[in-house]
Amino acid sequence: MSQFNNTNIIENTPINKMHQKKSNILDIFTLDNIRTNHSSDKVFFKITSDKPLSTDKLGQHFDNTYHTGLNICSIPFETKGSCVDGGIYFTDKDNILKFLFYGIYLRKVDLPLDDPGFIMVKDPDSCASSVKWRASRVILGNRLNLRDISTFKYLMSLGVDINVDNDKPLRWAASRGYYGLVKFLLDNGANVHAYDDEAVQLASRNGYLNVVKILVEYGANVNANNDYAIQMACKYGYNEIVRFLVFNGANPMANRYYPIEIATEFGNKLIVRFLLHQDKSMVYKSYAMDIAVRNENWDLLNVLLLD
């Protein structure tokens, strides 16, 4: 137990408070922050991407570049504040899948407890629904690809709920077009209707027809959120997704004709023509023509006039 006495592990306390009784340091150490080497159910993980990215983009915090083995924070460690740049962030196995949008690689985190430069705090923004820590240095294991089903099987073997946080893994996989993973999650209890059927909306918005199809096969509601799925497919020009959604019950006149409005706005001629055949009323056609004139899209206007 003597190895703990020189290890700076604190929970939202200034570094100068570390000069207290050794028993108190031990209490902080054993009661909350570190059970990873003493309890089989406390396992830490981190999600990383291919390259360092700032928090306003998809990726990990700030400018740390991560590799297998010992990683040391490139700037001075900060003991106060939340989501600050002075520290390497990670969480435990029960929370790791809540941070999927930070990258595509899962890494096991071990703590260099014997390293005198090791400092660790629990982030003050941590709550019952989302817990994270940061440390001055950590030991990262090999990368496991979160796009691979085998990685999720590994997490399941540790008792991780792979449908955590309103089925975030399903919504994440659908938004990125990971068909095999989407099917695996659905076959293992994921709720296709989670978050107001967000999975099918995200897959439609990002153009993944095969994912849209399997979600609908498993019962996804294509009319959810005021037919958001078809609206986004019309906006981004995904003709086949628009057709599939309409043939499976999506409303081409949803939200006061928004599908044809947005398709016309973005000049998606094939979609505009398809939508016009769903409602041959002059009101619908005139609406599209007005938008084409406003945008001076004479090519599309010609299509509308001749259709």
UniProtKB/Swiss-Prot annotation:
Q: Which UniProt keywords apply?
A: ANK repeat, Repeat
InterPro entries to which the protein is assigned, alphabetical = Ankyrin_rpt, Ankyrin_rpt-contain_sf
Instruction: Cite the repeat ranges for ANK.
Output: 135-164, 165-194, 196-224, 226-254, 256-284, 286-307
Gene3D superfamilies with a match to the protein in the record: Ankyrin repeat-containing domain (1.25.40.20)
Name one matching Pfam family.
Answer: Ank_2
Name by which UniProt lists this protein? Putative ankyrin repeat protein R229
